[in-house]
């Protein structure tokens, strides 16, 4: 079948016109302009709905973390192939043993870096790092508006207090901060308080009640913490969307994703993938050059098709 093609960036109204042209060019030529480095599965929080979280003693059972040398070499090759936007995430990325070396080296290479963190550790040496090499932005996941809710959701004491302190330090340094929340039964009572916290601190805020099943982790606890009402509302909105914007089967399925032909995700153990939630394809960045791995990923995406039923 011959498919219609349309880059998802054409539907991203918020994207600057100049950058939209850049992304269109990247889409046309399959240039990996945007990447995510999942530095580590380590995390100081213990959220039941997280799909990338291992205790240090368990990491070796599932794989081996990439070293600073490996991440830096991947970044050099990715830059040569066109990567400009880079998201650094985890787990909690600040817990990678070589975070400082990795981050500062990548910053010196000129990437537009967004850091995704829970915000708990933003103090001391990390403040100095971000003062010297400010990221383009920091996205912090807000789990509640009190220490009590952080204890329920994340299993950690003084969570909100520490995160609030980190946010204020970042604001003082004028580093752009964005707050995001996943709303569950454990924190729904503080949803409005979280939104108000973002408002009074003049920080962009987004929340979701949708907890996606991930095939990278067992999902046994997810049904227990999902907010059923949010699921129903979400389903209704999804149905309305597809009534008004029916899926075009003449259009290649991957083109509905903004990262198709221009974005990638590299896992903590060195697999390059299309999406953070998937456990395939199994393309090892340790065994191939970045260019070869990217080409294989694009080929994998191009082979994806609609299901028969």
For the regions a language model picked out, list residue spans one by one.
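Conserved alpha-helical substructure of the radical SAM core
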Residues: 2-137
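Radical SAM enzyme [4Fe-4S]-AdoMet core and its adjacent flexible, acidic
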Residues: 1, 136, 141-261, 265-269, ...
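Alpha-helix N-cap/helix-start and coil->helix boundary motif
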Residues: 44, 100, 146-147, 291
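Residues that scaffold the ATP/ADP-binding catalytic core of kinase and kinase-like folds
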Residues: 46, 50, 125, 148-149, ...
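Short, intrinsically disordered, charge-biased short linear motifs at domain edges
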Residues: 33-34, 238-246, 299-305
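Flexible mid-to-C-terminal extensions adjoining Fe-S/redox cofactors in radical SAM and related proteins
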Residues: 1-25, 29-31, 254, 269-309
């Amino acid at each position: 079948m011959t498919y219609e093609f349309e880059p998802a960036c054409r539907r991203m109204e918020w994207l600057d016109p100049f950058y939209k042209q850049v992304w269109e060019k990247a889409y046309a030529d399959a240039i990996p302009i945007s990447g995510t480095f999942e530095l580590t599965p380590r995390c100081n929080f213990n959220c039941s709905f997280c799909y990338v979280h291992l205790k240090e003693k368990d990491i070796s059972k599932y794989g081996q973390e990439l070293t600073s040398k490996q991440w830096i070499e991947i970044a050099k090759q990715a830059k040569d192939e066109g990567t400009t936007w880079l998201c650094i995430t985890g787990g909690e990325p600040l817990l990678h043993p070589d975070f400082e070396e990795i981050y500062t080296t990548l910053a010196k290479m000129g990437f537009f870096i967004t850091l995704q963190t829970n915000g708990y550790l933003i103090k001391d040496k990390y403040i100095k790092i971000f003062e010297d090499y400010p990221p383009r932005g920091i996205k912090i996941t807000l789990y509640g508006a009190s220490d009590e809710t952080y204890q329920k959701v994340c299993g950690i004491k003084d969570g909100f207090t520490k995160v609030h302190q980190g946010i204020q330090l970042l604001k003082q340094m004028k580093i752009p901060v964005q707050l995001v929340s996943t709303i569950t039964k454990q924190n729904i009572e503080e949803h409005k308080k979280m939104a108000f916290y973002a408002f009074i601190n003049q920080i962009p805020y987004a929340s979701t009640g949708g907890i996606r099943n991930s095939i990278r982790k067992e999902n046994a606890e997810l049904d227990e913490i999902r907010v059923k009402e949010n699921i129903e509302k979400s389903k209704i909105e999804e149905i309305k969307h597809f009534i008004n914007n029916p899926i075009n089967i003449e259009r290649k399925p991957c083109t509905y994703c903004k990262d198709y032909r221009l974005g990638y995700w590299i896992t903590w153990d060195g697999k390059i993938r299309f999406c953070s939630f998937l456990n395939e394809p199994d393309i090892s960045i340790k065994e191939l050059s970045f260019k070869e791995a990217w080409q294989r990923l694009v080929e994998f995406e191009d082979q994806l098709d609609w299901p028969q039923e």
